[in-house]
């Protein structure tokens, strides 16, 4: 499966947080997050391992009890079932991979 970049199909996850599923396979799912300065992702946990790469901007991530300020080029790995949250310090773009596939992030036709 190949992905050709376009700006359609973003879904609003929270105020100032949009997500787009880029591509997925049997075991992984790749997403792009577009985050507006001041937006937050509340503390939560899920079964999926989550790895991320900050393309641009600045975010503050709390994973478990550790807090990190991430800038462009920084990466993270969140083990499954570990609580985490995020605060967007500047308009940002992040790429994240989830394993196993998050069914709630699949395009409507694939759920």
Indicate where each model-derived feature is located.
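A short, N-terminal "cap"/entry segment at the start of jelly-roll beta-barrel domains
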Residues: 1-27, 107-111
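Anionic, Ser/Thr-rich low-complexity intrinsically disordered regions
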Residues: 31, 63, 95, 104-108
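Conserved short histidine dyad/triad with adjacent acidic residue
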Residues: 31-45
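Glycine- and acidic-residue-biased ligand/ion/polar-headgroup-sensing regions
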Residues: 48-59, 64
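A cytosolic small-molecule/anion-sensing beta-strand core signal
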Residues: 55-56, 71-72, 90
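Short acidic-glycine-tyrosine-enriched beta hairpin
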Residues: 65-80
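Ligand-binding loop in jelly-roll beta-barrel domains
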Residues: 80-104
